[in-house]
C-alpha cells in the first residue's frame, strides 16, 4: 500500500509540472481528481471558482488574500482567453492604470468583449470581473498584449477614457500623457473618429501638464480638418504638476509625479529641522545608545523573535556560528547578527552625512553595502545562496494581505536610480526621510529585508537634517503598515507623514533629555 506521504509527493510532482515557467493559475481539468483533491486538502492549491485553481501555500492563514492577489492578473488573462479567445480587452481606464504602473489590485475588472453577457463573475477576496458586451472589437492597432492581458494602447486609451478619469487619477493621467512622444498616434484616432470634444479635452490636459506644443498641434490639426474644437482642462483646479520629460519610463514618471504631489503634505506636518549637529560625536553616541531598542523593534516588526538578551549577545561578540550549531542554524540569531552588521554600515553612512555629504548621492551606493551586511550571516550559514547578495530582485514580490503589488521586477532597474535622483535633488530632509522610506517600500527592490532597509534609509535621511535616529515600535505595527498601505493604494501620504513626524518628535525629546542628563553628569 502506498503511504500517504508518497501519494502527496506524487500530487506535488504533478503540480510542479504545471508550475513550470512560473504559472500559478490552472484549470481543474489540468489535474486528475485524486491529485486535485489531495492538493486542495493539504493547502497547496486553492479554488477560485468552479473549474479554476491557483497555487497556494499550506502556511497561508485562512482568509489570507496574498495567494490570490499574487495570481490575480494571471487569472484574469487565462480566464478571459479561455472564455473569449482573442475577442476581449480590458477597459480603457484599467489599461491606462496598468500602462502608468498602477499595480493596485482593483476590486472589479471590466472586460470589453463582443461575447460578453453584462454579468458579474464573483472571485476571491471581494474581487470580481464584469464582462461588458460590446458590438465590435477595436482595430488591432489599438490593442497591445502585456503579460497575457489585452490592453488598449496608451494613445487609444487616452481617446477613450471619460473626463472623470483625469480628475480621479491625475498622476496616472500625467504619466500616460507624458508617455506620448509624438502626437501623431493620438491625432490619427481623433481625426478618424471625428472626436472634437475629446480633442479639446486632451489639448487642455497636455497644456496643463506642461506640453503646450502638443496641445497646439492637436487644436491646429483638428481645425485644419474643419472640426470645431473648444479646449477644456479636465483636471481639478487645485491639482499641481511637476514637469516630466516626454518618453520617461512610466515607473519613473509615476515616482516623480507622486513625489511632487506628496512633498507639501509631508512638510505641513513635519517638525522643524534642527540642522546638522555641531557635536557629531554626541550625535553618533545617541545612535549607539538607541541600537538595542531599534534592533528589537525593527526585527520584531518583521516577525523575528528577538530578545534584548540576544541583541546584547550579538553586540558583545557572543554570536559564534563557527563553534555553535545553534547560532549557525537559528534564524532569529542570524537576523540579529545581520542587523548588527548592517546597523554599523548605516552608522558609517550617517557619520558622513552629518559631516556634510549629500545623502542621496551617498546612499545611492551605500545602501547596497547595508543590504549585503544584513544577509551576509544567512549566506555564511548556508541558509541563502551567495547570489542572494547580488542585488535587486529578478522576480515578482507580494505583500501579505495588501491589494498593493510592487512594480514588476523589470521596472525596478529604472525605479531605484530614480529614487536616489529624487532624494539627491530634494532640499527638505523631512521629505527625503518620509518619501524615501515609503517609496523604497513601494518599489520593494529586494526579495527580502525591504522594511528594515526602508527604515535604515529613513534614518540616514533624518540625519541629513540633524533629526535623531528614530525607532518605529512593534506595538505600532498595525498603524504603521496601514499608513503605508494608504500611501501606496490611495496615494494618501498624510497618515504616514503624521506617523513618522510623531515618532521623530518623540525621538527629539528623548535625545534632548539624554543630552541634559549627560550635562548634569
Feature names for model-found ranges:
Residues 1-33, 40-50, 56, 60-521:
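FIC/Doc superfamily catalytic core
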Amino acid at each position: 500500500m502506498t503511504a500517504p506521504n508518497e501519494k502527496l509527493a506524487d500530487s506535488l510532482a504533478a503540480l510542479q509540472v504545471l508550475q513550470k515557467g512560473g504559472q500559478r493559475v490552472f484549470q481543474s481539468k489540468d489535474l486528475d481528481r485524486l491529485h486535485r483533491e489531495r492538493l486542495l486538502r493539504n493547502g497547496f492549491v486553492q479554488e477560485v471558482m468552479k473549474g479554476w485553481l491557483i497555487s497556494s501555500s499550506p502556511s497561508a492563514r485562512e482568509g489570507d488574500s496574498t495567494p490570490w492577489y499574487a495570481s490575480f492578473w494571471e487569472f484574469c488573462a487565462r480566464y478571459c482567453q479561455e472564455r473569449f479567445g482573442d475577442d476581449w480587452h480590458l477597459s480603457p481606464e484599467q489599461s491606462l492604470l496598468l500602462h502608468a504602473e498602477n499595480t493596485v489590485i482593483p476590486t472589479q475588472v471590466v472586460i470589453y468583449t463582443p461575447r460578453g453577457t453584462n454579468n458579474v463573475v464573483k472571485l476571491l477576496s471581494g474581487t470580481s470581473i464584469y464582462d461588458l458586451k460590446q458590438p465590435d472589437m477595436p482595430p488591432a492597432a489599438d490593442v497591445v498584449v502585456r503579460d497575457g492581458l489585452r490592453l488598449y494602447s496608451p494613445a487609444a486609451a487616452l481617446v477613450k477614457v471619460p473626463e472623470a478619469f483625469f480628475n480621479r487619477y491625475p498622476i496616472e493621467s500625467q504619466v500616460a500623457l507624458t508617455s506620448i512622444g509624438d502626437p501623431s498616434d493620438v491625432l490619427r484616432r481623433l481625426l478618424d473618429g471625428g472626436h472634437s470634444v475629446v480633442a479639446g479635452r486632451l489639448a487642455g490636459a497636455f497644456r496643463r501638464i506642461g506640453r503646450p506644443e502638443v496641445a497646439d498641434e492637436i487644436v491646429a490639426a483638428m481645425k485644419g480638418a474643419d472640426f470645431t474644437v473648444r479646449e477644456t482642462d479636465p483636471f481639478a483646479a487645485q491639482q499641481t504638476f511637476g514637469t516630466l520629460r516626454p518618453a520617461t519610463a512610466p515607473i519613473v514618471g509615476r515616482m516623480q509625479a507622486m513625489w511632487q504631489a506628496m512633498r507639501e503634505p509631508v512638510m505641513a506636518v513635519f517638525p522643524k529641522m534642527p540642522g546638522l549637529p555641531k557635536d557629531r560625536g554626541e550625535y553618533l553616541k545617541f545612535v549607539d545608545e538607541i541600537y538595542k531598542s531599534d534592533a528589537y523593534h525593527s526585527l520584531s516588526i518583521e516577525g523575528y523573535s528577538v530578545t534584548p538578551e540576544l541583541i546584547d549577545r550579538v553586540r558583545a561578540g557572543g554570536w559564534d556560528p563557527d563553534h555553535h550549531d545553534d547560532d549557525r542554524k537559528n534564524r532569529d540569531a542570524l537576523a540579529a547578527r545581520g542587523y548588527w552588521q548592517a546597523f554599523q554600515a548605516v552608522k558609517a553612512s550617517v557619520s558622513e552625512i552629518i559631516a556634510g555629504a549629500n545623502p542621496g548621492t551617498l546612499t545611492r551606493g551605500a545602501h547596497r553595502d547595508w543590504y549585503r551586511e544584513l544577509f551576509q550571516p544567512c549566506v555564511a550559514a548556508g541558509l541563502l545562496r551567495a547570489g542572494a547578495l547580488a542585488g535587486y530582485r529578478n522576480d515578482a514580490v507580494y505583500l501579505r494581505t495588501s491589494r498593493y503589488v510592487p512594480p514588476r521586477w523589470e521596472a525596478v532597474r529604472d525605479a531605484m536610480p530614480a529614487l536616489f535622483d529624487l532624494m539627491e535633488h530634494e532640499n527638505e530632509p523631512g521629505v527625503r526621510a518620509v518619501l524615501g522610506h515609503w517609496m523604497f517600500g513601494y518599489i520593494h527592490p529586494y526579495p527580502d529585508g525591504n522594511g528594515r532597509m526602508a527604515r535604515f534609509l529613513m534614518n540616514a535621511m533624518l540625519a541629513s537634517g540633524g533629526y535623531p535616529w528614530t525607532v518605529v515600535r512593534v506595538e505600532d505595527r498595525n498603524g504603521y503598515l496601514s499608513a503605508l498601505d494608504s500611501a501606496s493604494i490611495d496615494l494618501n501620504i498624510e497618515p504616514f507623514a503624521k506617523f513618522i513626524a510623531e515618532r521623530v518628535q518623540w525621538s527629539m525629546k528623548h535625545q534632548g533629555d539624554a543630552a541634559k542628563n549627560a550635562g548634569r553628569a
